[in-house]
């Protein structure tokens, strides 16, 4: 009996020592892990804090590199492996391009994690022809809305009311436009999308498999062309003017000149600090619902994470930690966009109004062919709403559709 006890204690001692060695090795391995994250200035501080919390728990090191948002996508394809990131902040419409080029890795979050997100946010980060795979974890959602200065105009129930009140305020304030919506010489298909969808336009159709079909281009759809005369009317009366850029639109609204401004939640703080009485709503239907584009932003794990030996750690950070309600609440507070995680929804009343304005919205296409659309669609609006000498809308949109089709091939 005594010998048995001795053997048992000896065995327990060996097991304890072995466990201690494994723990020490694990800790050393975690401490050796350095994860590089590329993000933009809006999120850098919050990403550093949130990722730092994960790193402290896991004995890892986080290095955050700040870049202009669009440069994250563009630089990922040219950076040397040694300088490449393991994790990036990304827009969902980058998914097709990055996945097709093998620059990001598919993610496989648990069913419990997936349940915390609206289906469209996960679909937005999914890509594939035969089988779709998830390439990003959603972190924030955004869409534009119609901001109404309620001291200058009533919230319109119809597009005709919007048009009438906008033109009345245009005349009163001696403006060259009725609705403060940004375009500028470069065009802005994103901010013009509610008008585009309301007239019956669409970007790509959907095939029998449920995938976007880049051969079905709706930039000059029959419904849009049938209603193109409305664009000519808006141009003639000055409801919309493509010479208006972002700064002009914002200043006109904040100075109490324009009664209507089309913008997104990134300007929520600006609105709250303006002292104006305002309401955010969806643009009223024209001939069809004037729905906005839906944008989803999140995090992706790059192909370089495996090269750097941190694939497992980077995946855990993104699929489990960045997906959590606590992490997304912190990120939302920093970048002024509602969190994608439904249990982390912001209680901010202005963000809630922008969320309500997203009803029926269309996720921006995430296939590579979308890169061929932005410029020409934006220019169709620029040319047809530039005031004197404008191109008839039907001509402008047919021209854009042909140019897009030629680029896609």
Where are these regions (language model features)?
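Extracytoplasmic/periplasmic solute-binding protein
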Residues: 133-139, 144, 163-213
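Conserved C-terminal helix/tail region of periplasmic/extracytoplasmic solute-binding proteins
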Residues: 359-409
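Extracytoplasmic/periplasmic substrate-recognition and gating elements
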Residues: 153, 272-334, 387, 391, ...
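Glycine-centered hinge/linker elements that transmit conformational signals in sensory
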Residues: 166, 209-243
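Conserved N-terminal structural module of periplasmic/extracytoplasmic solute-binding proteins
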Residues: 2-9, 24-96, 265, 287, ...
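A structural signal for short loop-to-beta-strand junctions that line the ligand-binding cleft
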Residues: 78, 84-86, 114-150, 288-291, ...
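Hinge/lid segment of periplasmic solute-binding proteins
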Residues: 92-143, 157, 161-163, 280
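Short helices/loops that flank or line small-molecule/ion binding pockets
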Residues: 73-84, 101, 167-168, 232-234, ...
């Amino acid at each position: 009996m005594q010998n048995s006890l001795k053997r048992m204690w000896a065995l327990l001692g060996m097991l304890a020592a072995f466990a201690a060695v494994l723990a020490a090795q694990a800790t050393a391995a975690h401490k050796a892990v350095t994860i590089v994250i590329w993000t933009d200035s809006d999120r850098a501080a919050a990403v550093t804090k949130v990722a730092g919390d994960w790193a402290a728990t896991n004995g890892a090191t986080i290095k955050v590199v700040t870049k202009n948002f669009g440069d994250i996508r563009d630089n990922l394809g040219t950076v040397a492996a040694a300088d490449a990131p393991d994790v990036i902040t990304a827009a969902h419409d980058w998914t097709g391009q990055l996945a097709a080029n093998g620059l990001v890795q598919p993610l496989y979050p648990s069913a419990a994690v997936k349940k915390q997100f609206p289906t469209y946010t996960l679909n937005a980060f999914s890509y594939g022809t035969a089988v779709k795979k998830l390439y990003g974890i959603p972190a924030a959602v955004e869409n534009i809305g119609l901001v109404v200065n309620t001291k200058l105009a009533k919230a319109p129930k119809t597009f005709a009311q919007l048009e009438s009140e906008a033109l009345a305020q245009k005349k009163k304030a001696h403006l060259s436009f009725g609705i403060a919506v940004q375009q500028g010489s470069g065009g802005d298909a994103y901010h013009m999308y509610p008008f585009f969808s309301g007239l019956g336009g669409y970007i790509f159709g959907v095939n029998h498999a449920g995938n976007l079909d880049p051969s079905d281009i709706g930039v000059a759809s029959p419904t849009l062309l049938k209603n193109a005369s409305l664009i000519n009317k808006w141009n003639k009366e000055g409801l919309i003017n493509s010479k208006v850029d972002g700064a002009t639109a914002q200043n006109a609204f904040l100075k109490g000149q324009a009664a209507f401004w089309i913008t997104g939640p990134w300007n929520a703080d600006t609105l709250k600090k303006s002292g104006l009485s305002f309401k955010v709503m969806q643009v009223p239907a024209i001939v069809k619902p004037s729905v906005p584009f839906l944008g989803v932003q999140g995090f992706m794990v790059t192909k370089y994470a495996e090269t750097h030996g941190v694939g497992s750690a980077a995946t855990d950070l993104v699929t489990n930690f960045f997906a959590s309600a606590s992490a997304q609440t912190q990120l939302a507070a920093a970048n002024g966009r509602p969190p994608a995680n439904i249990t982390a929804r912001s209680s901010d009343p202005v963000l809630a109004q922008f969320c309500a304005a997203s009803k029926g919205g269309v996720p921006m296409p995430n296939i590579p062919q979308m890169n061929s659309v932005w410029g020409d669609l934006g220019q169709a609006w620029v040319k047809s709403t530039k005031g004197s000498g404008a191109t008839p809308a039907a001509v402008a949109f047919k021209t854009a559709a042909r140019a897009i089709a030629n680029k896609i091939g």
